[in-house]
Amino acid sequence: MTLTSNHEVGDADGNHVYRRITLRLIPFIFICYLFNYLDRVNVGFAKLQMLDALSFSETVYGLGAGIFFIGYVLCGLPSNLALNRFGPRRWIGLMMITWGIFSTCLLFVTTPVEFYVLRFLTGMAEAGFFPGIVLYLSRWYPNQRRGRIMALFMSAIPVSGLLGGPFSGWILNHFAAGQGGMAGWQWMFLIQGLPTVALGVLAFFLLCDKVEDARWLTPEQRQRVKTDITHDELNRPVQGKSSVASVLTMPFIWVLGFIYFCIQSGVYAINFWLPSIIKNLGFSDALVIGWISAVPYLMAGVFMLLVGRSADLRNERRWHLVVPMLMGATGLIIAANFATVPLIAILGLTIATMGALTSLP
């Protein structure tokens, strides 16, 4: 059974409604995701001072950076069940307050175990945020509009690198003298963690759990969105119920999982080690490292938006994923093989960042 909809992506009324939704929701969600990603990967910049200050080895850092994802994986499903139970507004706000506190507490770390525990807890707290936001946006945007919105939302990743790199470098330099009895890396965790707590509090007031609660839309506009979403649901291919066991026996699930694993491996190799790689190219000043690290993220942000728009206009997804993935792999190969030539290595890292991050939406 299908429902014929007269609401096409190009109609003026629909564009007005969804533009209004976008202006209301996306700026706040964008800022939340920016700090989500910054709190997750700012250890890459903290590493420039933290390892020497605490006598941590590269192994300790690598394990601490990676143990985040154990907590992330373990709590992903429970967190999204809780989101459905308590509603996006309350659960997203609570998640942000919690991981903001854990991320800020990294400034108190003195031993590897403390580092591991806080990174693990941060991963647990962040687990439901991204999938929760994806689910949340699916309640506001029909499928035909969602590609561009997801690209806009996820452009917070390169923006976090674009702004976070120079900002982190400035913090490390500015507080290098130990103002307030804290080192630069400690100030960085404090300055970048506390805003997340504040954003979590704001989420309770700025987000709506569902379209029906959006009093800033007229009744006609709310009905328009509900009709578009219903049209999507009724035209979705009907599939029988599947158990967890039956899903895990599907080969394509494992193939998709492997593809996603490869994408994320490239993304986080860049996020966690880009500052150190740039330092090893001969740049020692933290602010200079921050500005250089911003270049790949600037290019990735532009490329991500262009690819997201192209995918929607052409209603094509496969090649809009394959090409960025190939770019990411090519860029990493270039960077690895020209590690002693700074200009070419940075070019390779830029291509890798453009491809890897654009593969995510």
Residue ranges and their predicted role:
Residues 43-44, 243-304, 360-361:
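Extracytoplasmic gate region of multi-pass secondary transporters
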Residues 55, 78, 87, 108-114, ...:
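Helix-breaking motifs and short loop linkers at transmembrane-helix boundaries and internal kinks
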Residues 74-113:
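Conserved MFS/SLC helix-loop-helix module at the cytosolic interface between two early adjacent transmembrane helices
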Residues 75-88, 302-316:
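Helix-to-loop junctions at the C-terminal end of transmembrane segments
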Residues 102, 114-128, 343-361:
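Hydrophobic core of transmembrane alpha-helices in multi-pass small-molecule transporters
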Residues 118-155:
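Cytoplasmic helix-loop-helix junction between adjacent transmembrane helices
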Residues 148-173, 195-196:
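Glycine-rich segments within core transmembrane alpha-helices of 12-TM secondary carriers
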Residues 317-361:
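C-terminal transmembrane helical hairpin of 12-TM major facilitator-type secondary transporters
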